Amino acid sequence: MKRWAAGVLTITVLAAACGQQTQKSEDASPVRRAAPDYLSQPLVREIYTADPSAHVWNGKIYVYPSHDVDGPTKQDDLGSHFEMRDYRVLSMDKIGGPVRVGPVALDVKDVGWADKQMWAPDAAVKNGTYYLYFPAKDRDGAFRIGVATSRNPMGPFKPQPAPIKGSYSIDPAVFTDDDGSSYMYFGGIWGGQLQRNVNGRFDPNGSKTDLGQDDKPALAPRVARMTGDMLEFAEPPRPVQILDEKGMPLLGGDHDRRFFEASWMHKYKGKYYFSYSTGDTHYLVYAIGESPYGPFTYKGRILEPVEGWTTHHSIVRWNGRWWLFYADSQLSGQTRLRNVKVTELHYAADGTIRTINPFTSPKAP
């Protein structure tokens, strides 16, 4: 584990288009590259970070990432080697400027119901209170989603005594619409256990991957409107329907397009953009809808495969431009030790997103 140290790093943000497909297993060793081969450079180097959820509040940019550590668990397809134990918030006054690494904002030892694996978080603000949403495994080995509060966006955050009632799986992402209503999107298959919670109840003996039904609709992420105090679901979670160009649900066997994990929602010119990772094919993709509940029609790729296995992101508007926060394994070359990055995101005139290549040169053979 790397210790925190105060420091800054000036980053250079570039933009590019096009890319290539890379298919690899969870335990594959990434091909190492020289720093100039990457489109963007790591935001921080003091600690390993991933799964960046970025927000613009009070004129500043706050990033809520996972905090990767080098634990003893052997790498597997369930992500058991992702042994995160706490959260630290990154902040910056501008993209391209110094980045501050905050102290511990929340530690697993302070969450009474949680046992381990504090994976990808998100955050929200309402009436001066900041909310940190996070998944963790309970003592039965089931992922639940908790919430902690603070008056400071950097924390420290005080957790609620129990997870959100009716929550399960991983990757919470909270979107607040123009009318003030907030919605949580969540879920992830394989190690994220969505396939073990099909009926809202955790089955410890369920599938380790998905439902194994390639010719039937893929497992869908979930969405639920939040209560006014942002601490609970105001309704039972419902599936988020992702459709193809013919209006049919994406199938479980369509690994290049179907949902795997890493939900994110943003709004652009009145349309709702639901983006997510395809997991084992390593694409970051998106679909567009007319309502925060969907349905959403698949439109294409945002980001081609990065170095490392996972792709988890956020999209925010800052200074009149749109930005994609993501992560790769540039610093370590290990899938469990990642680093967050940012690059500019561009829309075409028709509202589609131009695909980004995370590298500046083709991959070596």
Give the location of each predicted region:
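Carbohydrate-active catalytic/glycan-binding domains of CAZyme proteins
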Residues: Q20-P365
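Bacterial N-terminal signal peptides that target proteins for export
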Residues: M1-V8
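Residue-level signal for mature regions of secreted extracellular proteins and peptides
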Residues: I11-T12
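C-terminal motif of bacterial Sec signal peptides marking the signal peptidase cleavage site
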Residues: A15-A17
